[in-house]
Design a protein with these regions (language model features):
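Short, well-structured N-terminal submotif of metal-dependent ribonuclease cores
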Residues: 1-39, 55-60, 140, 146-147
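Active-site neighborhoods of divalent-metal-dependent phosphate/nucleic-acid chemistry enzymes
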Residues: 73-117, 146
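Structured helix-beta-strand junction loops
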Residues: 33-35, 71, 107, 125
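Active-site-proximal, substrate-binding regions of enzyme catalytic domains
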Residues: 21, 25, 39-86
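Alpha-helix N-cap/helix-start capping motif
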Residues: 7, 42, 78-81, 115-116, ...
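Short amphipathic alpha-helical segments and helix-helix/interface helices
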Residues: 25-28, 100-101, 119
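Alpha-helical elements of the RecA-like P-loop NTPase motor core of helicases
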Residues: 11, 50, 120
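Acidic, PIN/NYN-like endoribonuclease modules and their adjacent C-terminal/linker elements
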Residues: 1, 107-110, 114-147
């Protein structure tokens, strides 16, 4: 099971940097081809919409977000609050990161992120996490190993 940080999805949707885009899309394709279960905190909808709205029209943003939501399992705020609160207290991470890390913890998932600080905090919280930009090969090997 996988939790993808918003950064991975943004890199896949908007190719600001060709290398980040390639890595993100390859990981998404592998997750799809292996039919791996993806969990996301419901806050993803707001965060992803906010980022994409800076670069795309409302209509396109809504379409992107709706398409992603069709393929993931959203975990409600209430289900993650206590875990996210504990993670925030133990790591000092950003609030939104605490929800993604908490989602990985609650669903026993691997966290994938293009945010190095988030990955560091996830590891402090005992979560298996991969920094996509520098641990791409290790992540691909790990995903391939999942039955």
């Amino acid at each position: 099971m996988i939790v993808l940080d918003t950064s991975v999805l943004v890199d896949a949707i908007i190719p600001f940097d060709s290398e980040r885009h390639r890595k993100s899309t390859t990981v998404l394709e592998m997750i799809s081809s292996k039919e791996l279960v993806v969990f996301e905190p419901k806050l993803l909808v707001v965060e992803l919409s906010a980022v994409l709205a800076r670069y795309r029209s409302r209509h396109i943003v809504v379409n992107h977000v709706n398409e992603i939501v069709r393929h993931v399992n959203l975990v409600e705020y209430e289900e993650l609050h206590e875990t996210a609160f504990d993670i925030a207290l133990s790591t000092g991470c950003r609030a939104i990161d605490a929800f993604f890390i908490g989602c990985a913890k609650e669903t026993n998932s691997i966290l994938v992120s293009s945010d190095k600080i988030q990955v560091s905090n996830a590891r402090k919280a005992g979560i298996e996490a991969y920094y996509l930009l520098e641990e791409y090969d290790e992540l691909l090997a790990r995903l391939k190993a999942i039955a």
